[in-house]
């Protein structure tokens, strides 16, 4: 991550450990004889209730960092602890559980199911987590209300504005 900035909010002082703790994190890709250092020596701590923005020019390693933080990829070197657990020590099924229960993504293209309502799109992570239908409906509606879309729960993505689709994606990321 060359020439990249990490903008962080100023959370209230807390004695709790960081929920994200990276030390010397790096990722190298090898393609034939070419070695690409996509991420070099990143140190980052994120505390509970803290908001963080990862910014930088194209090719600076933002997506690589997000893939590592989201447990979609593994670092080539360094340490990444999520909730005090070293990610490198997790098995595939444990990583899948982390992605389903602890990490929410808002993708650039939102990745909403076109034929599903806003409510069903928000319910998806809860379905995968095995949450009962009643609780799933309640939690998804609550998440939609938190992003001011409770009144649009029965609309499909093509019936929503770009900003509304983005808020559905945010609700889906927050529902777990």
List each language-model region with its residue ranges.
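Pre-NBD coupling/linker segments of ABC/ABC-like ATPases
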Residues: 1-16
């Amino acid at each position: 991550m060359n020439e990249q900035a990490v903008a962080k909010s100023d959370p209230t002082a807390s004695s709790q450990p960081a929920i994200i703790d990276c030390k010397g994190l790096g990722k190298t890709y090898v393609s034939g004889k070419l070695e690409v250092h996509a991420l070099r020596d990143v140190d980052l701590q994120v505390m509970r209730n803290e908001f963080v923005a990862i910014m930088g020019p194209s090719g600076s390693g933002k997506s690589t960092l997000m893939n590592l933080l989201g447990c979609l990829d593994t670092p080539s070197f360094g340490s990444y602890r999520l909730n005090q657990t070293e990610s490198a020590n997790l098995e595939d099924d444990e990583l899948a559980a982390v992605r389903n229960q602890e990490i929410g993504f808002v993708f650039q293209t939102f990745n909403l199911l076109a034929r599903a309502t806003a409510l069903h799109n928000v319910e998806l992570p809860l379905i995968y987590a095995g949450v009962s239908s009643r609780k799933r409906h309640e939690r998804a509606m609550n998440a939609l209300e938190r992003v001011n879309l409770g009144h649009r729960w029965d609309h499909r993505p093509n019936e929503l504005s770009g900003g509304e689709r983005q808020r559905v994606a945010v609700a889906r990321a927050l529902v777990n």
